[in-house]
Amino acid sequence: MSSAVVTAGLTRRFGRRTAVDHLDLDIAGGEVFGLVGPNGAGKTTLIRILCAILRPSAGSARVLGLDVATDAARLRPLIGYMSQAFSLYQALTVTENLRFYGTLYGGVPARREQDVCRLVGLTADELARKVAELPTGVRQRAALAAAVLHGPQLIFLDEPTSGVDPAGRRDFWALIRELSADGTTVIVTTHVMAEAERCDRVALMAEGRVLACGPPASLRAATGTIVAVIEADPWQRAYAELAARWPGTTLRGTTIRVSLPAGADPRSLLAESLSTVRVERIHVTDPSFEDAFIWFIRHSHPVMEPP
């Protein structure tokens, strides 16, 4: 499928701070593409550039074949954008919000509005209530309805499940997959690693740069590591000794996680570091997506897989 988004050397600076740093991305049409990283990684700034809200400081970005710097007016009717704040008018009902957004796109047929409300699961009661009166999960679905009301070819979702409970998060991702199945390209930002694994491909971002890009399973495999989960007594000493030798060792409660080269015998490899403690359990597992993200941050080896 042809590319929905292509960037080359894309950069955005705010004074002396570089929020987006020479990004090269190629996102295929119809993909569910994740931008993953901690707060301050540059995800929201990148989305706002691709939506033609911010202009690049350098480099270029083409969205649906249009240059974001010179073709913003032609681009905006073709895309949808759901911000972290949900961008709804609190004093208006959901229906009034949808009608308002519909007018921005030259009017939306009543049938289309009904179909969208049905897609996101908005009830008649919810549609009639003011946004300020609604729980977060319903506001989230109303914001998605407003973003897709005009039938965009590409939709940007900026941390759409922030503050939403696990059930609401699961249902929302089912909606994302429905949109993708109909051919809509979805670009979503998140710092929740479990959500990132639902994407077709993800770009791992930190400090405005892309550290790696590819399918989640490929990125986990690209680390070339296994994870040893260790319980030892005394655990404080075990953690201190392992962390000194194996950077990236983490502690969760009293359980220690350490990344080792794939194919290694963890007991032999860790024997020296654990010689002064009693090892109660060593369990070896594949790296989680969170483990992979931490590994890429520490090693900063770019891995870029095409769409």
Language-model regions: role of each:
Residues I155-E159:
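Catalytic Walker B motif of ABC-type/P-loop ATPase nucleotide-binding domains
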Residues R99, A110-E126:
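Conserved ABC ATPase "signature" region
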Residues C213-G214:
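ABC ATPase "signature
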Residues T225-S300:
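Short, charged/small-residue-rich alpha-helical element at the C-terminal edge
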Residues A91, K130-G137:
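Conserved ABC ATPase signature
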Residues G59-D67, R74-L75:
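Conserved ABC transporter NBD signature motif
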